């Protein structure tokens, strides 16, 4: 018969006041007095009211004895006690016993003990040290006496076996173990199990300090598990050591016949096969809070009370007092959005506890609640993030604010979807902007230029912020004018252009222009002009002239004044044509257009 999770309550928790001037049965008065004492003992147990209400009379007595034994053990370690197990040497103790009269009496169990000076290090401010240490342990702690009775089990045993701590304390461990593995546990509880066979049992001292390694134990067994739907058992690896249990006389151990001090096994129990992340009974990290219209906290889940280290007497409390100072602006924007539109997008920020100043990474959303068609309160749905997810999303918060424009529960349920911003859907505003920014494909003389509007300007700015590559800006190209085209081709007339012009406006290599002689050749006929080839050009397409090295003629001689050439200086400068799009051009043509632009600009 294996253990099962069954607890029944068979006595009343609240006593009715005795009736006056009525005759009662003495046995009934005795039962009422006994029930009253049991209720008082039950309220002293370190459990919440919901757990205590499910305990029966025998469970209350069993748990009271178990916690008294644990307290007696640690009090015997911290203070001089007549129950100190002097029958075993110090090698079987968890730490060296040294009485400390100056230390005031404390009923706190030491979490860390300094072996150098033998002093317990208690930190009253570290209220959640036990919870943190159990999470980092990767298993639960189990203490067994030499008769196989569970002396102590940590609170997180429920996360691995499904049994509450109150179900297993002061119960035989064999009810939790498979019948084929019970003999292995009995052998491990025997202090002479690991004695070398070559040594005589009467000459070998297993409790000597040099033989302390023979007190170490390591065994695996199949434990009854209520969380396993396949076979109902979970293989657990038990690794620990035999130690003396102080403050526990031999007569207190159930079924014990041998006299003398009690020796027990203290071990750490971890799953033999580490469970996958999906199999772990993860804590529900979805939390909810209720706020006034100004953001003040009015109610919240019990987990939020523990996180923020506040109680109901502190309410109402301004929410901005709990938000990290660097995230107050983000919270204010979400608050304003909820007031205006009834809901806000997802926001990532940090909450800071009031006492220990611990930081929590939170992903939340706001919604407005109405009563009689009027705003009544604001509800926030929170999801706790780990430090890696929170730091990553905080770095991308500027990008997320531009994309998460509407509330979506799917992102709240799966915050890992937000780690890749490329997977987020684009809002409809950006899609409309992309449609209006498509390059024109009409065969006009010059490409159409869309008029920049505030919408397109914002879209371009968002596109630049979200882009991961730096796109080089192509310099603006001036529009060729009537005079400029006559310089390239004297036969060009206004309104008449080659047939291929609409298809490629700036592809000048197809029409090699005829450059006039520079004015410098008129004043200096003896100067030898050498053709120069520019890199990236075809030598047969365009030739530019360059003066010899070291020849610097006078500017007036280089350009002599002529009355017929006055229109050169009076001709207006070509206007710059700003295009919002970068048209793909070939590499060779790009250098050519740049040189032509410089020539026309001068």
UniProtKB/Swiss-Prot annotation:
Gene Ontology CC terms: aryl hydrocarbon receptor complex; nuclear aryl hydrocarbon receptor complex; nucleus
CDD domains: bHLH-PAS_AhR_like (cd19696), PAS (cd00130)
Compositional bias per record (Basic residues), positions renumbered to this chain: 1-12
Motif Nuclear export signal in this chain: 55-63
Tissue specificity: Expressed in many distinct neuronal cells including RMED, RMEV, RMEL and RMER. Functions in URX neurons to promote aggregation behavior.
Start and end residues of each stretch annotated as Disordered: 1-28, 440-467
Gene3D superfamilies: Helix-loop-helix DNA-binding domain, PAS domain
Domain bHLH residues, every copy: 18-71
Keyword terms of this UniProt record: Activator, Behavior, DNA-binding, Neurogenesis, Nucleus, Receptor, Transcription, Transcription regulation
Domain PAS: 126-196
PROSITE patterns referenced in this protein's UniProt entry, alphabetically: BHLH (PS50888), PAS (PS50112)
Domain of life where this protein originates: Eukaryota
Motif stretch (Nuclear localization signal 1): 5-8
Cleaved propeptide residues: 1-2
Gene Ontology molecular function: DNA binding; nuclear receptor activity; protein heterodimerization activity; RNA polymerase II-specific DNA-binding transcription factor binding; sequence-specific double-stranded DNA binding; transcription cis-regulatory region binding
Region (Required for maintaining the overall integrity of the AHR:ARNT heterodimer and its transcriptional activity), start-end ranges: 41-73, 133-141, 266-268
Nuclear localization signal 2 (motif): residue ranges: 28-33
Mutant phenotype after disruption: Defects in neuronal differentiation, axon branching, aberrant cell migration and abnormal aggregation behavior on lawns of bacterial food.
Places the protein is found: Nucleus
SUPFAM superfamilies: PYP-like sensor domain (PAS domain) (SSF55785)
InterPro entries (alphabetical): AHR/AHRR (IPR039091), bHLH_dom (IPR011598), HLH_DNA-bd_sf (IPR036638), PAS (IPR000014), PAS-like_dom_sf (IPR035965), PAS_fold (IPR013767), PAS_fold_3 (IPR013655)
Summary of the function given for this chain in its UniProt record: Probable ligand-activated transcriptional activator. Acts as a transcriptional regulator in GABAergic motor neuron cell fate specification and development. Promotes cell-type-specific expression of guanylate cyclase genes that have key roles in aggregation behavior and hyperoxia avoidance. Has no role in carbon dioxide avoidance.
Quaternary structure note: Interacts with daf-21/hsp90. Interacts with aha-1.
Protein name (Swiss-Prot/TrEMBL): Aryl hydrocarbon receptor protein 1
Organism: Caenorhabditis elegans
UniProt lineage: Eukaryota, Metazoa, Ecdysozoa, Nematoda, Chromadorea
Gene that produces this protein: ahr-1
């Amino acid at each position: 018969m294996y253990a099962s999770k069954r607890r029944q309550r068979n006595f009343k928790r609240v006593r009715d006041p005795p009736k006056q001037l009525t005759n009662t049965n003495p046995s009934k008065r005795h039962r009422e007095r006994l029930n009253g004492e049991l209720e008082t003992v039950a309220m002293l147990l370190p459990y919440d009211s919901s757990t205590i209400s499910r305990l029966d009379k025998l469970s209350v007595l069993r748990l009271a004895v178990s916690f008294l034994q644990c307290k007696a053990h640690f009090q015997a370690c911290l203070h001089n006690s007549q129950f100190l197990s002097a029958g075993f040497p110090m090698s079987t103790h968890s730490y060296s016993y040294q009485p400390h009269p100056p230390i005031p009496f404390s009923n706190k169990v030491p979490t860390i003990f300094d072996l150098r000076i033998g002093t317990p290090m208690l930190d009253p401010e570290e209220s959640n040290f036990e919870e943190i240490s159990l999470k980092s342990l990767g298993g639960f702690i189990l203490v067994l006496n030499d008769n196989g009775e569970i002396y102590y089990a940590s609170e997180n045993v429920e996360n691995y076996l499904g049994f509450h701590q109150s179900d297993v304390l002061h119960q035989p461990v064999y009810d939790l173990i498979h019948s084929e593995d019970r003999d292995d546990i009995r052998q491990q509880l025997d202090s002479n199990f690991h004695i070398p066979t070559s040594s005589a049992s009467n000459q070998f001292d297993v409790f000597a300090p040099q033989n302390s390694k023979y007190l170490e134990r390591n065994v695996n067994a199949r434990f009854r598990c209520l969380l396993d739907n396949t076979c109902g058992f979970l293989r657990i690896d038990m690794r620990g050591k035999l130690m003396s249990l102080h403050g526990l006389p031999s007569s207190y151990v159930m079924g014990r016949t041998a006299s003398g001090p009690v020796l027990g096994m203290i071990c750490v129990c971890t799953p033999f096969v580490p469970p996958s992340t999906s199999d772990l009974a993860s804590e529900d990290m979805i939390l909810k809070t209720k706020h006034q219209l100004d953001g003040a906290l009015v109610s919240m889940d019990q987990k939020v009370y523990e996180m923020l280290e506040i109680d109901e007497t502190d309410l109402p409390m301004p929410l901005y007092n709990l938000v990290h100072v660097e995230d107050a602006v983000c919270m204010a924007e979400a608050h304003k959005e909820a007031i205006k539109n009834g809901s806000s997008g997802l926001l990532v920020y940090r909450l800071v506890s009031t006492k220990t100043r611990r930081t929590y990474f939170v992903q939340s959303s706001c919604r407005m609640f109405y009563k009689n068609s009027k705003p009544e309160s604001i509800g926030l749905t929170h999801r706790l993030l780990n430090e890696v997810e929170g730091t990553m999303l905080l770095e991308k918060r500027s990008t997320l604010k531009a994309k998460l424009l509407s509330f979506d529960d799917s992102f709240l349920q799966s915050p890992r979807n937000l780690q890749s911003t490329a997977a987020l859907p684009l809002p409809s505003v950006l899609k409309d902007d992309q449609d209006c920014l498509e390059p024109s494909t009409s065969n006009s003389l010059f490409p159409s230029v869309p008029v920049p509007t505030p919408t397109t300007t914002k879209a371009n700015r968002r596109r630049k912020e979200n882009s991961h590559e730096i796109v080089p800006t192509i310099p603006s190209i001036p529009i060729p004018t009537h005079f400029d085209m006559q310089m390239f081709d004297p036969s060009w007339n206004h309104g008449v252009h080659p047939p291929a012009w609409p298809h490629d406006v700036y592809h000048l290599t197809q029409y090699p222009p005829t450059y006039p002689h520079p004015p410098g050749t008129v004043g200096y006929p003896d100067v030898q002009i050498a053709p120069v080839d520019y890199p990236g050009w075809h030598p047969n397409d365009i030739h530019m002239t360059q003066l010899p090295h070291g020849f610097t003629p006078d500017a007036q001689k280089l350009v002599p004044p002529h009355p017929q050439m006055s229109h050169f200086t009076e001709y207006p400068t070509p206007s710059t044509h700003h295009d919002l799009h970068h048209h793909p051009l070939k590499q060779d043509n790009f250098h050519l257009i740049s040189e032509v632009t410089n020539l026309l600009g001068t």
